[in-house]
Amino acid sequence: LFLQLASAHHLLADPGISTEWKVVNTSYFMYFAVLASMIHALSIPGAMEVAQRARGYNKGLFEWLRKAPWGNPTFSGVFIALVGFGFLGGITGVMMGTEQLNLLIHNTIYVPGHFHATVVIGTTLTFMALTYFLIPVLFQREMIAPGLAKIQPYLFGFSMYFFCLVMMGAGTLGVSRRHWDMAFQGAALAYE
């Protein structure tokens, strides 16, 4: 519920939204959305930690993470998706929830970088990991190319991290979205 209320931060630069709604959205609703996101962001890694500690990985704070099944595409896919969704997509979403910063970057390619971090890294990679879990369970067969399955979440996840960071960096430099000519020169290519 709170995440849906705070999603209006995508409308902060639009003229049809009242000032009062913008103030309420960038303050109270955004705080609730961050709270709901943090509950989600801490419960899934916490469940992973509890499962690893139940398997006996109890030495020190991070043995459970060092000894995690990183070769299992289900685990690595979910973990890479959590980091991309939570940190890359989540922190940038909170940043764009402030009206001052939103007005600066709203019509830049920074926003599609944020969307790709949340939807493509977070959601798509999680469903890929779920597929790696369900195929052997449902069909009672091994994966066709297990070596390729082990590296696929890393290749896809880190490539998307790079893609999103480049889009966000370009947006910070002012590269526009929604317009084909970022220099507004009327030239098909800026060097002509």
Indicate where each model-derived feature is located.
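Membrane-interfacial, low-structure loops and terminal tails that flank and connect transmembrane helices
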Residues: 50-71
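Catalytic cores of extracellular degradative/oxidative enzymes
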Residues: 17-21
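Flexible, glycine/threonine-enriched loop-and-boundary segments that flank and lead into catalytic domains
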Residues: 102-111
